Amino acid sequence: MSAAKQLFKIVPLTPTEINFLQSLAPVVKEHGVTVTSTMYKYMFQTYPEVRSYFNMTNQKTGRQPKVLAFSLYQYILHLNDLTPISGFVNQIVLKHCGLGIKPDQYPVVGESLVQAFKMVLGEAADEHFVEVFKKAYGNLAQTLIDAEASVYKTLAWEEFKDFRVTKLVKEAEDVTSVYLTPVDGFKLKPIIPGEYISFRWDIHNPDITDIQPREYSISQDVKENEYRISVRDIGIVSDYINKKLQVGDIVPVHAPVGTMKYDSISKKGKVAVLAGGIGITPMIPIIEHALKDGKDVELYYSNRSYQSEPFREFFSNLEKENNGKFKLNNYISAENQKLQVKDLEHINPDEYDVYLLGPVAYMHEFKTYLVGKGVSDLKMEFFGPTDPDC
């Protein structure tokens, strides 16, 4: 991909303009979700061509509007310096790159946001507000465009590439692993453990005509020029994958990206992995690489039931093969087993790298505990939109 496209001129806001926008922060906090929900409705009606870049399930549940509202609020609070939210911004950049977001889509979002503010705030969204907001939005949009251009240059390929399904394996009663290889024979490079790939699914449903974008973690390193994803049946697309996808089917795949990557240069000798349910998928290559690096690995693995627990045999064998270097701690909710913070009391932040992924409530509980314990470099990500609740 070429150099970043310059669609917006970055013009620093004046102190007066910053104060004006920040004075509206309480309004954005209170009405932000209404604004963003209105924005998406307007945008999808006015610019239907962008629908295929958005997960419509996240629209229906309100997760995507909530995340965008949170993003706008945080941007307004940090107009002087984005450094405190740089991690959050980086997750957005990588998400956009994984989905193949293009610079030309930013003016569409900007115009739709302006219209939504006018509809929701009425006279409060006057000419002065619109002028200052457009300036601030343009600065943010071009910053993201520049950052995304830098990421695109590092990816293994541009755009989406057709992959063929080579194998389907049932890992649990509601989890299927999908093995895929490039149709054109492209040689896949080893992944960085923790990366995910984005898909564009046509699920052949007469009631759902839009292409459905989804991201799934790569659940093992590249073998035989194949990626593997492992998908739990919890939604429209995942139901299609588990029940209707067939060997030989073709699906477009974007190059891997990721925020929760294995830290291969860490000098710490121990790794603790906390995984809830299907959050185990990116942890598998992370665990394997940590063991190859000679680290002691502890897995705290929570599932609803034995029937819903994927990779049970794999982890059991891994424990046997590694002579005490890998310790598996299983927690099954149906058996009244639950990971407790007391199970993690021994974790010394100076000795352990810690990885965390699972349902939002699970992540919130253990993130709060681990950060309070002094784990300053906790490695985690979110399935779905970057969640402001965690």
From Swiss-Prot:
Reactions catalysed, as given in the entry: 2 nitric oxide + NADPH + 2 O2 = 2 nitrate + NADP(+) + H(+); 2 nitric oxide + NADH + 2 O2 = 2 nitrate + NAD(+) + H(+)
UniProt: FAD binding residues: 196, 214-217, 382-385
Binding positions (heme b): 96
Domain FAD-binding FR-type: 158-263
Entries under CDD domains matching the protein: FHb_fungal-globin, flavohem_like_fad_nad_binding
Main location: cytoplasm
Keywords annotated in UniProt: Acetylation, Cytoplasm, Detoxification, FAD, Flavoprotein, Heme, Iron, Metal-binding, NAD, NADP, Oxidoreductase
Binding site for NADP(+): 277-282
Source domain of life: Eukaryota
Subcellular localization, as worded in the UniProt entry: Cytoplasm
Cofactor(s), names only, from the UniProt record: FAD; heme b
Covalent S-S links between cysteines: none
BP-aspect Gene Ontology terms: cellular response to nitrosative stress; nitric oxide catabolic process; response to toxic substance
Domain Globin: from-to ranges: 12-149
Free-text function comment from the UniProt entry: Is involved in NO detoxification in an aerobic process, termed nitric oxide dioxygenase (NOD) reaction that utilizes O(2) and NAD(P)H to convert NO to nitrate, which protects the fungus from various noxious nitrogen compounds. Therefore, plays a central role in the inducible response to nitrosative stress. In the presence of oxygen and NADH, it has NADH oxidase activity, which leads to the generation of superoxide and H(2)O(2). Under anaerobic conditions, it also exhibits nitric oxide reductase and FAD reductase activities. However, all these reactions are much lower than NOD activity.
Name of the protein: Flavohemoprotein
